Amino acid sequence: MKQFWVDARPWNKDVVTTAIESGADAVVAEKAADVKRLGRITTVAPDGDLVPGKDVIECTITDKASENEAAANGKNRIVIVTTSDWTVIPLENLVAQSDKIIAEVKNVHEAELAIHVLEKGVYGILLKTSDPAVVKAVAALVKSTSGSVQLVPFTVTKIHPVGMGDRVCVDTCSMLADGDGMLMGNTSSAMLLVHAETLENPYVAPRPFRVNAGAVHAYILLPDGKTAYLADLSIGGQVLVSDHKGAGRSAIVGRTKIERRPLLLVEATAEGGAKASLILQNAETIRLVAPDGSAISVVNLAPGNKILGCALEGGRHFGMAVKETIREK
């Protein structure tokens, strides 16, 4: 997920308060103590959590030499980049060489360009403004941009009960909508979109903050492109929520519930040959997502049905994709 920092130099209490309320990740200030009095947030200051010149380097790009200096610093430290005439080209060059670049921006337009430069975007942005309304607007942009997911239709090939086991419900701190879900899989090479519990049914009330995600061993896709085991999710962590069009956003984990339940196995294949499978609870309220965004209960699922999923780079080490021979089956 992109970092959202706000520059409070010179001191601006309204901007800092709005930054904290909008979920900013850090505030750059002359005195960390001024920020800490308003709320808990990472500070970048001589007396802060991150110290300029040590943990964070600030560079102004004026020519190729300063660009090279920023790239060199970005190999092992966060670099805040400023340009005298804000352009995309220096950022493209820097993003190609470092994944620790934070771009200084002044408005929503500049923030959007920086977030999407070379598709992967910068590590984060530093907003320099005296207008709290701009802070809110840029915060909304950054927090809604957790990266798109390329969803494709999978054809169900098999579904059958496998017995009793432990499954995980992921309760988030967000209200999810119809068509929203999380991506899970028995392997890290392909995952299926499991629908949130947003729908009315005769048996239980909707729980629109919840996804009944799957068995404890399953992988879940996170906002930074990494994966985690469902059993390892914990309060305060973050998960990726995607709609049926692949638009992703981050959600905070409020709690997880692990309970022993009857399980079933779903297997599906994409047109390109990718094979996905997932073990889910065998209950009417557990649903996968059709290409049109509608929800299909696992009790009604049949071979030949189309459901959404994604194919990923297989092989993970501590949740990160690795290039080595790893077979998952």
From Swiss-Prot:
It is an enzyme of class 1 (oxidoreductase). Pfam families: DHQS (PF01959). InterPro entries: DHQ_synth (IPR002812). The keyword Oxidoreductase applies. The keyword Amino-acid biosynthesis applies. Keywords: Amino-acid biosynthesis, Aromatic amino acid biosynthesis, NAD, Oxidoreductase. GO terms for molecular function: 3-dehydroquinate synthase activity; dehydroquinate synthase activity; NAD binding. It comes from the Archaea. It catalyses: 2-amino-2,3,7-trideoxy-D-lyxo-hept-6-ulosonate + NAD(+) + H2O = 3-dehydroquinate + NH4(+) + NADH + H(+). One of its GO terms (biological process) is amino acid biosynthetic process. Its EC number is 1.4.1.24. Belongs to the archaeal-type DHQ synthase family. NCBIfam families: PRK02290.1-5. HAMAP family: Arch_DHQ_synthase. Catalyzes the oxidative deamination and cyclization of 2-amino-3,7-dideoxy-D-threo-hept-6-ulosonic acid (ADH) to yield 3-dehydroquinate (DHQ), which is fed into the canonical shikimic pathway of aromatic amino acid biosynthesis. This is 3-dehydroquinate synthase. It comes from Methanoregula boonei (strain DSM 21154 / JCM 14090 / 6A8). The lineage of its organism: Archaea, Methanobacteriati, Methanobacteriota, Stenosarchaea group, Methanomicrobia. The gene is aroB'.
